[in-house]
């Protein structure tokens, strides 16, 4: 990737001087990187000269490498001097802390777990205030959840004889919940399949199963909502997100995660993307006893179930 940027980074004007005076890179290295087919072992960099400039793995982006180098320089400055100015971050990077997507409660866990509590809401209308239940849904099985910002619905594990990449219990929960969300938003503010609701799940088999359950409802607008993987959802948003974890075996937890570490904090980039797609409400369904085997998921369930 980096050699392809050379033409842009080294652009000269007719006088032979730099044609571009400053480059500003904006991104989030705590979310999913580009998809690389090679394993980390296959793309590992062993050349000492490349390691000296901070290039340890060919999977790392230029953005991430520059950020890592500047973070290291900043840490070295702070440990090499006791002058108060050493507490000032490196002048070449900073963090954008204000976010206008998520409601405060939706942002609570990812903000605390992945961003050190530094994210602040812009203060848009959807980021605050209470939700009101549509009167016709008072007898709905999800009446107690439809006005919550974040909720977890436990599912049953798939029998051993079935594929681990499908969970019928979760598919049925997702479909029934989607129907309730459709009725709620259609009555209160209007339902737009491309804006209101999206479903995230890790496997194509589960995607197909969820779509089948939704189609059986006979609610035409729901058949147009996006049901896809977290990788395909990155960069997009919906008012409401339903996340079907589809973990039926403990070994699947490794596939479900995309781990990195910063300042001693373990960050699951895949979970971070999934939890930050929702503007107004975030619903999750999964097998709790399996999810709790992962410390980050255990903390997530603890926060959600006690909020």
Please describe what each predicted stretch is.
Residues 1-307:
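Conserved helicase motor core of SF1/SF2 NTP-dependent helicases
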